[in-house]
């Protein structure tokens, strides 16, 4: 069967090469890297909607996700959420010490659990961010309960902080934003979805539309910045880590609670400082 499409809308070789560079770097079967993905929340929404269907259940074994994902999932009512499409959501909060509640995670996984979403970074919370090793242990635990469950890792703020990524420890999908670590400060827009080929393809049908997927999408001249940013990303991430350690040292000495502290190992580039009052911020 011959499929004829407007040549001007087809993906150029520069796109495909960039995606292969990402896939090779992250050791995955496939990767979707596009400027049409506007931010990390958008990338996560594409991955979730692309791989979940009505009647499926989504499980977060790491507590509440980012505020922006609450409306995507339907934790807070919003138009077009996963909840509106019949996807149910379960959540298992972390234990008081910030570790995984394996007992209740085991109870939460059931025959309808289609996808488990794991947020690597603390985000706006004060819990510790998770190491790749911890994420691998959680994925292994979940897969023993339900081998066919899709394990997705929100890798925002975590790329290149460690020598390995969640895709190296069993993640089926790994999602991130190019306006954070992998963009190296040069990417003006974009996101990536890396992982199993079928999962990435499913996400691509949500990014564009069924039947087209990753075969279309103009780059509007930003690919050069995406390539250069990805090349510089490890160095830029290193600089961000140095800045975070420096900030932790300063605020610690001023008496403010900080997470992580100035000597703890770092799993992302986020530095939390508890100022205590609105006036403290000013």
What are these regions (language model features)?
Residues 1-7, 11:
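Single conserved hydrophobic/aromatic residue that forms the stacking wall/gate
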Residues 252-282:
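Conserved C-terminal alpha-helix-loop-beta "cap" of PLP-dependent enzymes
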Residues 5, 14, 242:
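N-terminal glycine-rich, Lys/His-bearing helix-loop that initiates the first secondary-structure elements
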């Amino acid at each position: 069967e011959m499929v004829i499409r407007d040549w001007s809308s087809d993906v150029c070789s520069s796109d495909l090469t960039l995606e292969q560079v990402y896939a090779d770097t992250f050791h995955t079967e496939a990767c979707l890297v596009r400027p049409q993905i506007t931010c990390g929340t958008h990338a996560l929404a594409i991955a979730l909607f692309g791989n979940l269907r009505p009647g499926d259940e989504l499980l977060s074994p790491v507590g509440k996700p980012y505020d922006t994902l609450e409306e995507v999932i339907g934790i807070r009512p919003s138009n077009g959420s996963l909840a509106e499409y019949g996807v149910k959501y379960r959540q298992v909060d972390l234990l008081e010490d910030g570790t995984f509640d394996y007992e209740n995670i085991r109870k939460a996984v059931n025959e309808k659990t289609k996808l488990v979403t794991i947020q690597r970074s603390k985000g706006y919370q004060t819990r510790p961010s998770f190491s790749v090793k911890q994420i691998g242990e959680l994925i292994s635990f979940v897969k023993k309960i339900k081998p066919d469950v899709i394990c997705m890792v929100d890798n925002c703020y975590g790329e290149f902080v460690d020598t390995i990524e969640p895709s190296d420890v069993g993640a089926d999908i790994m999602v991130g934003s190019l306006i954070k670590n992998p963009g190296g400060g040069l990417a003006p827009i974009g996101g990536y979805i890396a992982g199993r080929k079928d999962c990435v393809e499913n996400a691509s049908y949500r990014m564009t539309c069924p039947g087209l997927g990753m075969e279309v999408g103009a780059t509007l001249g930003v690919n050069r910045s995406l390539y250069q940013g990805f090349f510089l990303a490890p160095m830029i991430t290193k600089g961000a880590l140095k800045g975070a350690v420096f900030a932790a040292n300063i605020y610690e000495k001023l008496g403010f609670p900080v997470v992580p502290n100035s000597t703890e190992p770092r799993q992302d580039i986020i530095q939390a400082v508890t100022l205590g009052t609105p006036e403290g911020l000013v």
